[in-house]
């Protein structure tokens, strides 16, 4: 016999009991996201989900995303309750631009040392995002990895699968001269451009919790959860002929709108049709950021753009506003042989 210390996984920095405690904490909120197609509960090796029976030729649409360095800001400010909504929003908004209804969502949560309260707060936010978008949170992975992350830092990633009728896929192929662009207002910077946000905070020596804009702290503006457009857009698709949808994420106006335009089509944006929310004016002024860079990095108050026939634009705006969105006509599509795919006047 030797007198060597008997080591455990916990001695190495992995607390299985904490992981089990987390699962117990989140079971209730996860259950609230359940859809009838989901078979079984948490804890299986894989999640089972049937396809909704209303689809004749169902096409699965998948997506994965994170929340970028907005997470760093949330960790620095110790605000973990809405970052999960951001995570879901970034995934499901990408799915709905193709006309897809989100079915189920999985998350990946990685940290050096698992803090059950923090993780539960994040996952509760994920469940809230799933409820807002009508998809089921069917599982996830919580990875406690000592030595991989500094202090209490963590990272999150999301994975979503949706379904769309094959004949109703929205891919931009129907976009034509004369179509109108309808904008959906953003709730803030959403989940893009936060490395620049943090640089502006640093250079301007601004404390986001002390500095106020329009009666709210800058921190509240910056950490406002990403708007989830799924239910409003799916409802709209049933009533009007949507030709294309663009989710304004990384790359802003210049890169995301061209992704859904056929060759030879140009989107002309009327800059006078809306006012930038105060947070974007502050970012531009405090960081001396050029107009071009603002439109390349941020959504500037526009979270999503829908392209549809001119004769249906007013109806679409009315339908979207009645469903709780702030929508307006922001531009038009013209045919062009040369020039940029997006022009902002």
UniProtKB/Swiss-Prot annotation:
GO terms for biological process: 'de novo' IMP biosynthetic process; adenine biosynthetic process. Pathway: Purine metabolism; IMP biosynthesis via de novo pathway; 5-amino-1-(5-phospho-D-ribosyl)imidazole from N(2)-formyl-N(1)-(5-phospho-D-ribosyl)glycinamide: step 2/2. Transmembrane segments: none annotated. GO terms for cellular component: cytosol. The lineage of its organism: Bacteria, Pseudomonadati, Pseudomonadota, Gammaproteobacteria, Enterobacterales. It comes from the Bacteria. Keywords: ATP-binding, Cytoplasm, Ligase, Nucleotide-binding, Purine biosynthesis. It is found in: Cytoplasm. Its EC number is 6.3.3.1. Gene3D superfamilies: PurM-like C-terminal domain, PurM-like, N-terminal domain. The gene is purM. The keyword Membrane does not apply. This is Phosphoribosylformylglycinamidine cyclo-ligase.
């Amino acid at each position: 016999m030797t007198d060597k210390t008997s080591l455990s996984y916990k001695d190495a920095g992995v607390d299985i009991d904490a992981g089990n405690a987390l699962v117990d904490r989140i079971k209730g909120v996860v259950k609230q996201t359940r859809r009838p197609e989901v078979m079984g509960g948490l804890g299986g090796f894989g999640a089972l989900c049937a396809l909704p029976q209303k689809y004749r030729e169902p096409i699965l649409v998948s997506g994965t995303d994170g929340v970028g360095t907005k997470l760093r800001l949330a960790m620095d400010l110790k605000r973990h309750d809405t970052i999960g909504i951001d995570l879901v929003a970034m995934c499901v908004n990408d799915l709905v631009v193709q006309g897809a209804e989100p079915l189920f969502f999985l998350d990946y949560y990685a940290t050096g040392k698992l803090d059950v309260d923090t993780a539960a707060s994040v996952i509760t936010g994920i469940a809230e995002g799933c409820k807002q978008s009508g998809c089921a949170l069917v599982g996830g992975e919580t990875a406690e990895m000592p030595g991989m992350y500094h202090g209490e830092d963590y990272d999150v990633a999301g994975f979503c699968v949706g379904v769309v009728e094959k004949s109703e896929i929205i891919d931009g192929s129907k976009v034509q001269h004369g179509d109108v662009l309808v904008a959906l207002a953003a709730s803030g910077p959403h989940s893009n451009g936060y490395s620049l946000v943090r640089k502006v905070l640093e250079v301007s020596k601004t404390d986001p919790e002390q500095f106020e804009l329009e009666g709210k702290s800058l921190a509240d503006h910056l950490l406002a959860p990403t708007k989830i457009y799924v239910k409003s857009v799916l409802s709209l698709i049933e009533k009007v002929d949507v030709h294309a949808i663009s989710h304004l994420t990384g790359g802003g106006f210049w890169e995301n709108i061209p992704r859904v335009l056929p060759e030879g089509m140009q989107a002309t944006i009327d800059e006078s049709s809306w006012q930038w929310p105060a947070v974007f004016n502050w970012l531009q002024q405090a960081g001396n950021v050029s107009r071009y860079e603002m439109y390349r990095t941020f959504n500037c108050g526009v979270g999503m753009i829908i392209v549809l026939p001119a004769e249906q634009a007013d109806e679409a705006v009315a339908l979207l506003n009645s469903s709780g969105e702030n929508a307006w006509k922001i531009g038009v599509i013209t045919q062009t042989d040369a020039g940029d795919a997006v022009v902002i006047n």
